[in-house]
Each structure stands twice: as C-alpha cells, then as structure tokens.
C-alpha cells in the first residue's frame, strides 16, 4: 500500500472514533457523537419522498441549489440583519466539516498561524495544518 503524505504524521486517531469503539466494546452510552433521538419532521420526510418520486437524483450546482441559497439569504437578513447575495456570498456544503476545511483553505496562506480555543472540535487543528497553518492552542 502506498504511504500516506508526511503531513498526516501529525494527526492522531479521532477521539470520537476512539470513544465510539470503547462504548461499543463495553456496552456504554456513547456521548461522543450527536445521534439525533427524534423523528425528522413530517414535512421534511414528505418533501424527500416527493423529490425521489419526481426523479430529483442529480447533483446540484456545486455551491448549492439557488432556492436554498435564496432562503438562507432571507433568513440571515430577517434574523441577523445581514444582507448577503445568494449568488456570490453563500455556499452550501454537505456539512460543517466540509465547510470548515473549504473556508480555511480559502483564507489561510502557508505559514499563517491559527488560534484554537478550548474546548474545540477535533478537526480544527488538522484542518489548519492541511491548510498550511500552524495551530496554536
């Protein structure tokens, strides 16, 4: 098997993965992951079923569906007074982890430093390193 890039030598196993493994082994309660313990709202389930039945199975534009970006823009303005252009100021990602690395890659230059305040999500340091920065804890 090909060796991993040297940059990965500074990374450790995910604490979340480690705690999950331990909980599974001893039958404990896993508090390290966010497992929703509630049903999805009926309207969301119905919308998903409708989309599947109507053949909505293609990739969207890479920065998110226009209707969703427009809705986010309206909510940002209504709730926070922030005016943002849904065409140029909003990108929809598959989750916070993707958003975080994409943002850091966009704003960090090699040699920059980032300050990571505790407590922190375990990806902050590795994402900073992958972006060329040195994390300071």
How should these model regions be labeled?
Residues 1-4:
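Basic/polar N-terminal segments that are highly enriched at the extreme N-terminus
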Residues 6-95, 102:
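N-terminal small-domain helix-loop-helix segment of the aminotransferase-like
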Residues 106-137:
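PLP-dependent aminotransferase-like
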